[in-house]
């Protein structure tokens, strides 16, 4: 290492130190998905980030998605993927595939990545220890669904659920040890039926119940932008609501923002929308002065 490289390394460590001191002992819930789960270099940089967080005393809790992987396996099985209002119609056969992909393939791949990069992780679904109590999601028809449907009609999209409750005992047990919890967003109801739940919603609810310091949502965009295309680096919940009302925030970003807003309004200190396509995005957001995405706080 030459003198310039050594100087740069020292500068980076010094910049990170106050953040490490500030966040040591706190919990950070990370929704892991998008390109960060598909590119090998990004997968390994994410794993190294969470291992380092654990090493310096920050407790990461990971909730992951897996929509593209589910769609890929369904296609290989000759089963068409259907969506209503952005949600996958999940019949019993599709639910079996969801559980295989999320609870098996994707979850264990993340666990293996973390362990390969020097950490310890345990993979869970919401069915383990009844971690995620679910109820069936009820959708009302919209004009976009079908002209034949009345606006008040209920659409059955099968085993798609929403979070009714989170039992944190198993997360607390793992997070308080050397292990990093890796959670697949599959819930279970009182009758033992399984439900596919949006990973952003699960991450938000887990963050709320754990009273997490941060909720981090990895996305395929660099953050929230204003109407001129400039990144909005710091926003209050009041400002976010005004940006929704004036149409600056719209479309596919609305559910993520809704999840972040609800988390911050219910006890999470800050929520972050960051670009998962950037190597080491998580560490850059929480341990540097500038960060790399949009931070949302209550005031």
UniProtKB/Swiss-Prot annotation:
Keywords in alphabetical order: Amino-acid biosynthesis, Arginine biosynthesis, ATP-binding, Cytoplasm, Kinase, Nucleotide-binding, Transferase
GO CC terms in record: cytoplasm
EC number: 2.7.2.8
Molecular function GO terms recorded: acetylglutamate kinase activity; ATP binding
Record: residues binding substrate: 66-67, 88, 196
Pfam families reported in the protein's UniProt record: AA_kinase
Entry keyword annotation includes Cytoplasm: yes
Pathway: Amino-acid biosynthesis; L-arginine biosynthesis; N(2)-acetyl-L-ornithine from L-glutamate: step 2/4
Cysteine disulfide partners in this protein: none
Protein task: Catalyzes the ATP-dependent phosphorylation of N-acetyl-L-glutamate.
Name of this chain's protein: Acetylglutamate kinase
Recorded name of the encoding gene: argB
């Amino acid at each position: 290492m030459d003198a310039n490289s050594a100087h740069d390394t020292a500068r980076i460590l010094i910049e990170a130190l106050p953040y490490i001191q500030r966040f040591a002992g706190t919990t950070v819930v990370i929704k892991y998905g998008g390109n960060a789960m598909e590119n090998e270099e990004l997968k390994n940089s994410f794993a190294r980030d969470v291992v380092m967080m654990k090493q310096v005393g920050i407790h990461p809790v990971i909730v992951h998605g897996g929509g593209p992987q589910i769609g890929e396996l369904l296609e290989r099985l000759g089963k068409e993927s259907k969506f209503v209002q952005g949600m996958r119609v999940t019949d019993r056969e599709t639910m079996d595939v969801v559980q295989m992909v999320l609870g098996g393939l994707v979850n264990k791949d993340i666990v293996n990545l973390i362990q390969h990069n020097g950490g310890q992780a345990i993979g869970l679904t919401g069915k383990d220890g009844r971690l995620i109590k679910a109820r069936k999601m009820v959708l009302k028809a919209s004009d976009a669904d079908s002209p034949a449907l009345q606006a008040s009609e209920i659409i059955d999209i099968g085993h798609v659920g929403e979070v009714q409750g989170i039992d944190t005992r198993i997360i607390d047990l793992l997070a308080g040890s050397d292990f990093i919890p890796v959670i697949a967003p599959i819930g279970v109801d009182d009758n033992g039926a399984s439900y596919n739940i949006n990973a952003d919603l699960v991450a938000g609810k887990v963050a709320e119940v754990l009273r997490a310091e941060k909720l981090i949502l990895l996305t395929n965009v660099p953050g929230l932008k204003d109407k001129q295309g400039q990144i909005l680096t710091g926003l209050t919940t009041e400002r976010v609501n005004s940006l929704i009302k004036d149409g600056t925030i719209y479309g596919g970003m609305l559910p993520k923002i809704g999840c972040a807003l609800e988390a911050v309004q219910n006890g999470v200190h800050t929520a972050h929308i960051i670009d998962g396509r950037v190597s080491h995005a998580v560490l850059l957001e929480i341990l540097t002065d500038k960060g790399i995405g949009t931070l949302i706080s209550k005031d």
